[in-house]
From Swiss-Prot:
GO terms for molecular function: FMN binding. Belongs to the NrdI family. Pfam families: Flavodoxin_NdrI. PANTHER family: PROTEIN NRDI. GO terms for biological process: protein modification process. This is Protein NrdI. HAMAP family: NrdI.
Length: 136
């Protein structure tokens, strides 16, 4: 497994961001019947759903992944994507997950992100793991 876990819908925006990021990552399956377990601490990268409100912002697949105690115990931070058209609620899945899991919300980016987002996340992830213990 890897230190980054992500979910991407069929739009593939988050997947394209992760490909451009170029860091090892594990994808939460789109098919809700497929399950994965993560055996090391990780940062979760997640898109926000819905029309800008908190209800429905976190994808069902991510909820199911985090409802697994084994996976939830290893989350160390969250990065969220979203759409600025949602106003103050853009990227709010990150806020919901950070609050419910008691981890920091590290960054948010719009849609597929910009090169600046890629650079910021790459640098931030490296700094985060240097400062944070990886022990489960």
């Amino acid at each position: 497994m890897s230190a980054l876990v992500y979910f991407s819908s069929s739009s593939e925006n988050t997947h394209r961001f992760m490909q451009r990021l170029g860091l090892p990552a594990t994808r939460i399956p789109l098919n809700e019947r497929e399950r994965i377990q993560v055996d090391e601490p990780y940062i979760l990268v997640v898109p926000s759903y819905g029309g800008g409100g908190m209800a429905g912002a976190v994808p069902r697949q991510v909820i199911r992944f985090l409802n697994d105690e084994h996976n939830r115990a290893r989350i160390r931070g969250v990065i969220a994507s979203g759409n600025r058209n949602f106003g103050d609620a853009w990227g709010c899945a990150g806020d919901v997950i950070a609050q419910k899991c008691g981890v920091p919300w590290l960054y948010r980016f719009e849609l597929m992100g910009t090169q600046r987002d890629i650079d910021n996340v790459r640098k931030g992830v490296n700094e985060f793991w240097q400062q944070s213990p990886r022990s489960a």
